[in-house]
Amino acid sequence: MSIRDWPEAERPREKLLEQGAAALSDAELLAIFLRTGVTGCSAVELSRRLLSEFGGLRALLEADLASFCGHLGLGVAKYAQLQAVLEMGRRHLAERLRRDSILESPQAVRDYLKARLRHEQHEVFACLFLDTRHRVLSFEVLFQGSIDGASVYPRQVVKRTLAHNAAALILTHNHPSGDARPSLADRQLTARLKEALALIDVRVLDHFIIGDGEPLSLAEYGWL
């Protein structure tokens, strides 16, 4: 049955307009993005099939071009459209951060870091550089690969901090495994960077580790 033949209250688009996007299932949201299904399969049915094939919404959103286009109903145009939507979301979060002090919008920090790092397939270490009022000056990826004490150089972090004339930093890196619990190396690295930055009177406010759930704050656990 075509979605046009469904009761109006059950159609994804009408449901979104009436109840808000949060009321929709992953399949319903994806159906609105796809707009149409394929022969013998409505957009919602196709969405359910795709979510099953990918193993969930996150895997679909993070798929590379070859993987994405290897599924029925998806192609290069849809991939480009999806990347544009995701990038607009990241830029919206970045603008939220730049408007206010990060102390006034801590959830915005978490949301932004999740959007920037969760999709990375390899470990990435980055910094949010802040001014004296704790407003964001810049977000910068500094190191990629295996993030440990041997691969992250305090000298380079200090150099970029001085270049931005930053007064404080938030450190962050991701765990592609999805487990955000910090390793001993993570905690030792944080201590080394905090010590190096203290020499130039710059504070490390937090170190967030990005995994599958909410970002883990080392400061909240007393590890900073």
Curated annotation (Swiss-Prot):
Keywords: Hydrolase, Metal-binding, Metalloprotease, Protease, Zinc. Zn(2+) binds at H173, H175, D186. It comes from the Bacteria. InterPro entries: MPN, RadC_JAB, RuvA_2-like, UPF0758, UPF0758_CS, UPF0758_N. Residues 102-224 form the MPN domain. A motif (JAMM motif) lies at residues 173-186. GO terms for biological process: proteolysis. One of its GO terms (molecular function) is metallopeptidase activity. Belongs to the UPF0758 family. This is UPF0758 protein PA5319. It comes from Pseudomonas aeruginosa (strain ATCC 15692 / DSM 22644 / CIP 104116 / JCM 14847 / LMG 12228 / 1C / PRS 101 / PAO1). The lineage of its organism: Bacteria, Pseudomonadati, Pseudomonadota, Gammaproteobacteria, Pseudomonadales.
